[in-house]
Amino acid sequence: EEIVMAKKKSSIPESEENNVKVLNEELVDITEEVKKVREQIKSFYDVTTTEEIEVPENLIDQVIGQDHAVEIVKTAAKQRRNVLLIGEPGTGKSMLGLAMAELLPKEDLEDILAYPNPDDPNTPRIRTVPRGKARLIIDEHKAMAKKQEETKRMILFFVIGAIVVIALTQGQLLWGLFLAVIIFFGMQTFRIKNQVMIPKVLVDNSKWDHAPFLDGTGAHAGALLGDVRHDPFQSGGLGTPAHERVEAGMIHKAHKGLLFIDEISTLKIQMQQAILTGMQEKAYPITGQSEMSSGAMVRTEKVPCNFVLVAAGNLETLRDMHPALRSRVRGYGYEVYMENSMPANEENIKKIVRFVAQEVKKDAKIPHFSLDAVAEIVQEARRRSNRKNHLTLRLRELGGMVRAAGDVALSRGDNIVTVEHIVEARKLSRSLEHQIADDYIDRKKAYQIFGSTGAQIGKVNGLAVLGEGSGII
């Protein structure tokens, strides 16, 4: 309508009418494309909203557009191989890592305990037991200690009572009370030393019904490799035993499971070397990570850490990653490059529709989408791909628009998300670069440097391309 009105106001000659008609036909084609997508969706699903679309239960089946990576992950999980995932943010690397943990064979998980070492207190002994047995062992030791404590308390009261009675009969009550106090504190010291023999559970796998999954992204050395807590009281019998201060790291908690590390190149080289050592020897001792701590004097026996490593990052990760660690992954696993887009065919459009249903179900707070709204999301995926006849696979950002549209619908009190909500959400979920570019354009409009509506003979505007995730190029 704006084009037709501009044509009348400008009195565009007949020679220029064809150009206006072509532009108008292109606008009509875009609308027809949305209708075409909607009809395709209706042919896939005999539904009216995404609420009726079935979402797969298995996490690996919820991965969208990464067919090659899914096949590699299935093979790696079956054979317990390491995997290095390289790709842009939001393409499903973390989801693949979590899905792989569900696919790992259910081996006999083990609990890990730390025992005191009478020969060398600063080298606690490490023992493994079947899953769920560690707590039983601790309960047995506590019950035994409690029984011994009750017996000693009875003996203590008997001895103190006997001393007081004898002191009264001999007329030496003051000396009797003094002796009773000495015996009382002596028994307390013996009780403290006796409690040292109770072991500590380092890894408790009783809560896992499948292979453990640990996300070590951004973890510091102590959390990843284990640590020994500082003890301010190191003498006089008041210090905490070394084995009770030992804390297991993620590489130990992931024993017979999976350790996922995103942006692995951000880890220090020393930490990458330690991870490599743990992968090679399938065991790694725990020691204090701070040289200023008393825990630095403690170094346990080797703690089992037979884990599968799934590392992720971008292309720069390959440059900063420890060469030996990458070689270990390649030698005992796979390297996978994540796709950024997929062809806009019927099968992949169906996947985007299922993705919308998955996001709504996962969020559990936003309403479901109408078919017209889903068709608009498909068109948004086409626009964000920055590639002809393709759909984007940066689904985290696309999911952000889905949630934003749901929030708009909720704010208006609507039970179904429509195209109108998506149009409003597109404005709300713009990137910072997009917002800055729009602000710049509005400022320039005030000075009439260029026009953005209508048609005018003899005036030419510069071409500005607004790419997804960037400003004006």
Predicted regions and their residues:
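Terminal C-lobe "cap" of eukaryotic-type protein kinase domains
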Residues: 425-429
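Long, K/E/R/D-enriched contiguous segments that form extended
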Residues: 418-423
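Short, Lys/Arg-enriched N-terminal segments with co-localized hydrophobic residues
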Residues: 1-4
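Conserved ASCE/P-loop NTPase catalytic core
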Residues: 19-346, 354-406, 411, 415-416, ...
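Short Lys/Arg-rich cationic patches that frequently serve as NLS/NoLS or arginine-rich RNA/DNA-binding motifs
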Residues: 6-11
